[in-house]
Amino acid sequence: MIIKKFKGEIKSIIDLSKTAKEIKIALSEPIDFEPGCFVNLFLDIGNEKVRRAYSISSPSNDRDNITLTIRLSPNGLLTPIFWNKNMTGTHIELMGPLGLNTVDKMKLNKVYLFAFGVGTGVVKSIADHFSKVEKLEKLVIITGSRSEDEILYKEYFNSLAENSDKISVMRVVSKLPEGSNIPRGYIQDHIDGLDFNNSDVYVCGQEKACNDLITKIKSTNPNGCNYFIEGFH
């Protein structure tokens, strides 16, 4: 992958939940990236050029457009703008693609993708890639959310599982009303019985959540398990 600076125009913004949006950006020039990559986004705010890193959530076969899935940080400089102002048509600067935890490094035929919150966006891109890998034997996708309203890309992941008996999807929610049939708690509460031997494990989300999950997986002493951890604050 060649890292470069380029420009983009925000073409559309979709509300995924009260705290998450998907931003589609038309690029000034095509880029090649591996799923799992991120870009740095630069935006002029006042007299300051603000930079933030966002993972790419779109498939890698579209080189002219990318989507970024962003989470509202109420006290942040950049994301509140997308909730308070119509940013469609805004021209931005980007740099990338960047990242170490990318699909070209995941060589095994059994893959686990775990996502907390907005980390579901990059897992969507990675899942799209592996759904097209013929030698894949098993792809397990588990996402974790605070509430049912914050589950992201539900229909997309359901469609993957419906179209392949090699793919399974589970959603775990920490805060649920009584009587809900959705698995309750955290992802690490629902991995008993999974075989992590000879597998690639990708985790994306807030750093503590990622570390807690990896600790639980490592406690099972799997052999030949590779870890790809994308933690953020």
Annotate each predicted stretch with a short phrase.
Residues T120-K132:
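Histidine-anchored nucleotide/phosphate-binding helix
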Residues K132-K138:
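Conserved S-adenosyl-L-methionine
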Residues I2-K4, R63, I142, R146-H233:
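Reductase modules of NAD(P)H-dependent flavoproteins
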Residues T102, V122-S125, L152, D212-L213:
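Phosphate- and divalent-cation-binding pockets in alpha/beta enzyme and binding domains
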Residues I10-I13, I56:
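Conserved hydrophobic positions within beta-strands
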Residues G36, G119, Q206:
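Short, conserved phosphate/pyrophosphate- and ester-handling motifs at nucleotide-, phospho-/glycolipid
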Residues I14-S17, S60:
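A generic structural motif
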Residues K21-Y112, S147, K175, F232-H233:
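FAD-binding FR-type
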